[in-house]
Amino acid sequence: MGFSVFTPTRSLDGVSGFFQGAFLLSLFLVLFKAVQFYLRRQWLLKALEKFPSTPSHWLWGHDLKDREFQQVLTWVEKFPGACLQWLSGSKTRVLLYDPDYVKVVLGRSDPKASGIYQFLAPWIGYGLLLLNGKKWFQHRRMLTPAFHYGILKPYVKIMADSVNIMLDKWEKLDDQDHPLEIFHYVSLMTLDTVMKCAFSHQGSVQLDVNSRSYTKAVEDLNNLTFFRVRSAFYGNSIIYNMSSDGRLSRRACQIAHEHTDGVIKMRKAQLQNEEELQKARKKRHLDFLDILLFAKMEDGKSLSDEDLRAEVDTFMFEGHDTTASGISWVFYALATHPEHQERCREEVQSILGDGTSVTWDHLDQIPYTTMCIKEALRLYPPVPSVSRELSSPVTFPDGRSIPKGITTTILIYGLHHNPSYWPNPKVFDPSRFSPDSPRHSHAYLPFSGGARNCIGKQFAMNELKVAVALTLLRFELLPDPTRIPVPMARLVLKSKNGIHLRLKKLR
């Protein structure tokens, strides 16, 4: 009986002691993290004191939301060369927008910034974009032949076919005078192109109602990944996976992976046919996916399923979304500068007449159109920034230095709007790219630069030329004055309110 009388008291004392211990441990951990946060921030302030910065919140940093580009352009004019941007917590990055600074960083072999790019891994895996070191070099060397001019030449006709499908859809619209949000159409068109060129897809995804689910998943992942990078709490995978954003991200990843898995499965099935297999093996240059399927690594083994899907996911995203962004912004730039649009149209007509076919040789015969495309990519670079994590200290030409471990972000948008290298940077002036106009080798980087530049830059540039040439033959592009696009910082440059144009049929 005595035991039963005292047990509840002892039990309560035990529970109370447990909670006291848990509270003290939690308090210790909070204090430890607070001290760690303070010391890290003080170290960063000292180490990067030569890089100016505007006042920021101690926890949220420079919370720019969707005003990032407006603020960045202010910094570019106010702080020559580079400046400091505080993100959430003790995270910071040095923004570089001077060609001399950019040249130094791109001339090194620093890895991609893990604190930023790691959040892409659940989506695109470790393909060319995220790989570093020896494995990156092996994959880059393996995939470079997929962009040999011998491969790219026949792609021009495929690109033209995809563009014409999009233009046919535009011609069938009931109300030609009503502004159209063009990015949706352009995104499906570039996806159609990359599916046919790189993945031997038959048919057209532009005519497949289910294809919209993939482009919508990519759009969602663009936004969700960007928000996660900027969040003070979503860096923790447990917290992120429990959040509504985490659940949306997993669902979008599932949709994207189902799409790419289907592409791989379909091509593998085609290669089970002996005739198709022999046809592929006899090619002088293999397509992108066939290179991956036939690849042998240095150990003699085939590419793992994980590596295979990572490269397919990476190129499926980069091969269509960045190009769709570029084409959409070029269309907008031409719509708002009708005199340049008309000059491009006249140039294209002089080469193609009223035809709908474009050849490889035609692409070098439209210099003014090419100048306009390049100027639009200067104003609206599809990838607004790239980041590196310094593997060793770096010193710039003016003597300022950054220690190992710091993230440097090459702010391509700021670089392209730097008034020290681009007079009147907000003005659309294609003559900047005339053959006799000199410029710094690293002042213009729409496809990044250095050893890790965009492997598909020639593919993308060809597609831009084909899309612009064929569109100008069939439509006059007019702006919607009620909805002026607002550039928005994401993984790929987007507009906060879409890109709306009026399309006037020419024939």
Swiss-Prot record:
Biological process, per Gene Ontology: arachidonate metabolic process; icosanoid biosynthetic process; kidney development; lauric acid metabolic process; linoleic acid metabolic process; response to 3-methylcholanthrene
Compartment(s) of residence: Endoplasmic reticulum membrane; Microsome membrane
Keyword Glycoprotein: no
Disulfide bond positions: none
Pfam families linked to this entry: p450
Entry EC no(s): 1.14.14.80
Chain residues that bind heme: 318, 454
Positions of the propeptide removed during maturation: 1-4
Residues with Phosphoserine modification: 437
Cofactor: heme
Pathway membership: Lipid metabolism; fatty acid metabolism
Function comment: A cytochrome P450 monooxygenase that catalyzes omega and omega-1 hydroxylation of saturated fatty acids. Exhibits preferential omega versus omega-1 regioselectivity and (R) versus (S) stereoselectivity for hydroxylation of dodecanoic (lauric) acid. Mechanistically, uses molecular oxygen inserting one oxygen atom into a substrate, and reducing the second into a water molecule, with two electrons provided by NADPH via cytochrome P450 reductase (CPR; NADPH-ferrihemoprotein reductase).
Protein name, UniProt field: Cytochrome P450 4A14
Taxonomic source organism: Rattus norvegicus
Gene this protein is translated from: Cyp4a14
